[in-house]
């Protein structure tokens, strides 16, 4: 244990947007002591030199990534690394007794062939991958509570699945008709310089990207199939919008019972998420906005029915860096440790 009985925690990949969100949130967590920050490109630099606005709170420097050293100093390790790297060190961390929460895609898939097909990385850690639990607490809370390794969901899948789950779990829709139309802010592309994320490129523009080939597609389909009880194919199209943080996922599907109305669905969603403190279902006729969730771990959901088409429209908003990334990982840790699910996480968004 760390000072004052707190749990010693490390972060590998601390210099990216996901990493800095983890640092910021963990520094305020009452049960955590942040003792290690690791990375590659920033080794030897103080964290304060990378993020001067946190200099008053974080006195650590970026260290080399050595799983043996990490395991000696940390009881819990968050991995915020590019896809294909976490799987190189996770087996050692688990062997040494660490609890691991991976924010990359490496441990989200039950079928590693699917992972390799979409991410292009061959894997030799199938035994380890078989022990991973998908880290969406609203669906898999009980499994997460007993996990040693959690594969934290992507931001698009988080927003999309929270909107779709009540419909699929209750058998209310024809699963094969599900369409997800999602918009994300630029921070979802990471901190590394990319032409399409330049202000001159992204501002005053809205653009679809990775149409029919976005890597989050099979992740969404995997969980939809789990909920439906059979293999499901989903049409998913992401868009980049000129905001910094936030995701809006709008889902469409054909209802099995065309007699259902919006009030019915609102009641069903509210009941489905009654034990989920981070999901807020809007009153009938109210639709969520990304600004509501910004800076918080909340997901706001609105739902409507179009009687002309017999389709349901579900709308879900999250902060892609918090509920879609770092905050959800900490939510999973709280569950793994037996703490209150809301501990150390922001409950109110920035507004305006």
From Swiss-Prot:
The keyword NADP applies. Its main location: cytoplasm. Signal peptide: none annotated. InterPro entries: AGPR_type-1 (IPR000706), NAD(P)-bd_dom_sf (IPR036291), NAGSA_dehydrogenase (IPR050085), Semialdehyde_DH_NAD-bd (IPR000534). The keyword Oxidoreductase applies. Its EC number is 1.2.1.38. It catalyses: N-acetyl-L-glutamate 5-semialdehyde + phosphate + NADP(+) = N-acetyl-L-glutamyl 5-phosphate + NADPH + H(+). Gene3D superfamilies: Dihydrodipicolinate Reductase, domain 2, NAD(P)-binding Rossmann-like Domain. GO terms for biological process: L-arginine biosynthetic process. Keywords: Amino-acid biosynthesis, Arginine biosynthesis, Cytoplasm, NADP, Oxidoreductase. It is found in: Cytoplasm. Pfam families: Semialdhyde_dh, Semialdhyde_dhC_1. Catalyzes the NADPH-dependent reduction of N-acetyl-5-glutamyl phosphate to yield N-acetyl-L-glutamate 5-semialdehyde. PANTHER family: N-ACETYL-GAMMA-GLUTAMYL-PHOSPHATE REDUCTASE, CHLOROPLASTIC-RELATED, N-ACETYL-GAMMA-GLUTAMYL-PHOSPHATE REDUCTASE, CHLOROPLASTIC-RELATED-RELATED. Belongs to the NAGSA dehydrogenase family. Type 1 subfamily. This is N-acetyl-gamma-glutamyl-phosphate reductase. It comes from Nostoc ellipsosporum.
């Amino acid at each position: 244990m760390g000072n004052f009985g707190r749990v010693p925690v490390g972060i590998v990949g601390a210099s990216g947007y996901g990493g800095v969100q983890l640092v910021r949130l963990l520094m305020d967590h009452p049960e955590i002591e942040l003792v290690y920050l690791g990375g590659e490109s920033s080794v030897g630099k103080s964290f304060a030199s990378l993020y001067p606005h946190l200099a008053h709170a974080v006195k650590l420097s970026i260290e080399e990534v050595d799983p043996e050293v990490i395991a000696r100093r940390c009881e819990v390790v968050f991995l915020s690394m590019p896809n294909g790297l976490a799987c190189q060190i996770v087996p050692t961390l688990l062997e040494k007794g660490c609890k691991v929460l991976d924010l990359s895609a490496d441990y989200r898939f039950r079928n590693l062939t699917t992972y390799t097909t979409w991410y292009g990385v061959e894997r030799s850690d199938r035994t380890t991958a078989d022990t991973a639990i998908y880290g969406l607490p609203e669906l898999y809370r009980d499994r997460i509570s007993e996990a040693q390794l959690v594969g934290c969901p992507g931001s698009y899948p988080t927003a999309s699945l929270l909107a779709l789950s009540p419909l699929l779990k209750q058998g209310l829709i024809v699963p094969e008709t599900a369409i997800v139309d999602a918009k994300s802010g630029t921070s979802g592309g990471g901190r590394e310089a990319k032409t399409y994320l330049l202000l001159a490129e992204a501002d005053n523009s809205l653009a679809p990207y990775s149409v029919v080939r976005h890597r989050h597609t099979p992740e969404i389909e995997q969980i939809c199939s789990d909920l439906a009880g059979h293999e499901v194919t989903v049409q998913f199209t992401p868009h980049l919008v000129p905001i910094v943080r936030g995701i809006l996922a709008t889902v469409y599907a054909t209802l099995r019972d065309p007699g259902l109305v919006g009030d019915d669905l609102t009641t069903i969603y509210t009941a489905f998420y009654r034990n989920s403190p981070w999901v807020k279902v809007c009153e009938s006729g109210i639709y969520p906005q990304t600004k509501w969730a910004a800076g918080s771990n909340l997901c706001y959901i609105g739902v409507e029915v179009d009687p002309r088409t017999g389709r349901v429209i579900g709308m879900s908003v999250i902060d892609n860096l918090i509920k879609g990334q770092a905050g959800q990982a900490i939510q999973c840790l709280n569950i793994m440790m037996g703490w209150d699910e809301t501990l150390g996480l922001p409950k109110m968004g920035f507004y305006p």
